């Protein structure tokens, strides 16, 4: 991996992001990696004050997926809610660091967090990841609670697409969308950051592979929801918190999406994190990471409060 001026406050990024997930020769190793992630996740214990349930949920095509639900102990049925769309390039399942972040959000905001284990590529390209998350959003909407859409990396694509879907289908809108180093556009050559940081923590070759595998069924009439940057009109969407990392291939598309939202008169908080990289928040106890996480929490608190007054 090329050397970049990452903040000394952060651990260097790991090497797993340089794996070519589309290389069939690596398939056995990738399966072992996924099994290891799942084993680690199975040992996760929520902090005091929270409960964790894993439910099997029937989704759009009649199949079932797992959905983790974190919530305060003794919480009322109609708690404010977050739909957390996890990252992983559409190739990887929920990782333990994501559960730690979800638990922190649930505890500090006093909310219920849904973490769906949506189906992943290569076995399940579009529309499975988006439709699976849409099924969970519809469950939340029926509860008639304030809710947030949250997604990191590939999950940012899903969260942004769900916000567009809710607008276009006139269903209950989210109070806000929180997009953390999000994937938003498959037209990678449009962005200078793709060239500047092509070998950074989320390398260009993996980004290209991700889009190729995710969209290999075509867009199936879901164009704007699968690739949110292609939506011609962003008016009427929820307010947004967008957090690109300075040293990331995805930086410029996140900034461009924030500017488009602003042009559509959508309130946007854009936080470019200096010296940071894709997936930096995996080190959840790091003081630098915690400072950024608390910024997110305060913004999400504002989002929930703003629509409840």
Q: What positions do the PLM features span?
A:
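Short beta-strand element of the alpha/beta-hydrolase
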Residues: 78-87
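Catalytic nucleophile-loop/oxyanion-hole region of alpha/beta-hydrolase
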Residues: 95, 101-102, 114-148, 287-290
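Gly/Ala-rich beta-loop-alpha elbow adjacent to hydrolase catalytic centers
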Residues: 151, 155, 159
